[in-house]
């Protein structure tokens, strides 16, 4: 029975390793595709400045929340 447990553990470790490796590979491919596409868009944007930013736009700044500090100054 000990051999069956170690074999099951070995299979689980191998499967988890394969899944982790495939996820890492997918992440690398997506990042590479995103960077290469943004580089192509950057080179195209020099000739056409009105082009869209594409699927990987730069991070926009967070929207400004209305500040309630000093709002009493606006009231009469």
Curated annotation (Swiss-Prot):
Keywords: Secreted, Signal. One of its GO terms (cellular component) is extracellular region. The keyword Signal applies. The keyword Zinc does not apply. Residues 41-76 are annotated as: Disordered. It is found in: Secreted. Residues 52-65 have a biased composition (Pro residues). GO terms for molecular function: hormone activity. GO terms for biological process: positive regulation of Notch signaling pathway. It comes from the Eukaryota. InterPro entries: Adropin. Residues 1-33 form the signal peptide. Involved in the regulation of glucose homeostasis and lipid metabolism. PANTHER family: ADROPIN (PTHR38492:SF1). This is Adropin. The gene is ENHO.
């Amino acid at each position: 029975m000990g051999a069956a447990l170690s074999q099951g553990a070995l299979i689980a470790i191998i499967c988890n390793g394969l899944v982790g490796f495939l996820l890492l590979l997918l992440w690398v491919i997506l990042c590479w595709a995103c960077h290469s596409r943004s580089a192509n868009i950057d080179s195209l944007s020099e000739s056409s400045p009105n082009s869209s930013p594409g699927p990987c736009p730069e991070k926009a700044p967070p929207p400004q929340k209305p500040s309630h500090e000093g709002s009493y100054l606006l009231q009469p």
